[in-house]
Structures are given as C-alpha cells and as structure tokens.
Amino acid sequence: MAIALVATYSVTRKSGLDALDACRTSKIMGGSAAIGGPFTLMDENGRLVTDAEVLAKPALVYFGYTYCPDVCPTDAARNAEAVDVLEEQGYEVTPVFISVDANRDTPPVLKEWTDFMHPRMIGLTGTPDQLKAVAQAYKTLYQVPENPVDDTYLVDHMTQTFLMLPGTGFAEIFSHDDSADRVAEKTACFLEATTASN
C-alpha cells in the first residue's frame, strides 16, 4: 500500500475579495501565486511540452505514479469522472497526471495508463531533476527509494490535486477525500467566476 505524505496548508485571506474568493476554501501561505510555475516535461507521446501548452485550458493536475497500487488510480479516476461531469455542464477541463517515478514511467507506460483513465488525460514525465523542480514549484512532496532491490518499489507522495486556470494559475487544492461531484462543483464555481469577471 502506498503511503501518502501528510502536509498542512495554512489558510489565509486577503483583505479584499477578488472574483474567485467566493469559491476558495483554502490558500497556500504566501498566496496562490506561490503554487505552480514554468516547466518543460515529456508527454506520453514522447514530445517535449511546456506548462503553457499543457495548461492552456483549465486543468486538474495530480502528481503520482502508474505503479501506485491504490491512491493514484483512485484519484486519477476521480479526476476523470469530475472532468466528464464538467463536460456535461459545458466546461472543458484537462486532467493532467505528472509521474514522479522517472525510472519506470516511460512515455509508453504513461500513455497506456492515461489513455485507460481518460482519453484526454495528459501524462507527463521527465528526468529526476526536472520532476523534482516541478514538484517543488507545486509545493508537493514525494520520495523515491534510492536503491530499490527490484521494480516493485513504492513511492511515497502527497495526494493533492491542483486546479490550474489559464491567466490565473493556481486556484484550489482538492484532497484525496473530495468526491468527483465535489471537485466538479468547486471547479465549475471557479470557471463561472472567471467568465463573469472577464
């Protein structure tokens, strides 16, 4: 069983409300701009892509690995279900899966896994240094065993899903316990607020 690292996020509030504040339940200390940033990674088709390409539309971004026995497939399936619920409401949201297991999650492995989860899910991988950098940008933690005895090792990792919006960046964090309906409802709130503010 994969062990999820536990992190506590401090809840903060600005003195003035922006158009998205009514939808937010939490923020990262330092503000929402503290989450995310530029990256270049390899997608499941073996193509180098940037954050600008991957996050050109609203996205649910999750860090995990395909060999994860329980948490990752559960969360990825939940995110995929939320994306389908949102699509029924007229919203296009991209499910993104960033692997933190550079050794095993090659593009072909990622492609098979993400295609099974959702036809529009984007799988990303990179070198250990690239993955470490993007994980740090998203304030997420993981730990790959340094010298595994075989290919059956587990990777400890956090289980948050990040809602990223074009032109806004980080909007919200969803936990492992949030249902697909909850993720869809909160995401729709942000998308409606973004549309109303434009």
Regions flagged by a language model, labelled:
Residues 39-59, 83:
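A short beta-strand-turn-helix
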Residues 42, 122-126, 143:
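Short acidic-hydrophobic, aromatic-tinged amphipathic segments that line or gate anion-handling sites
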Residues 74-134:
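Structural microenvironment flanking redox-active thiols in thiol-disulfide oxidoreductases
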Residues 34-36, 58, 156-158:
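Short, small/polar residue-rich loop motifs at catalytic or cofactor-binding pockets
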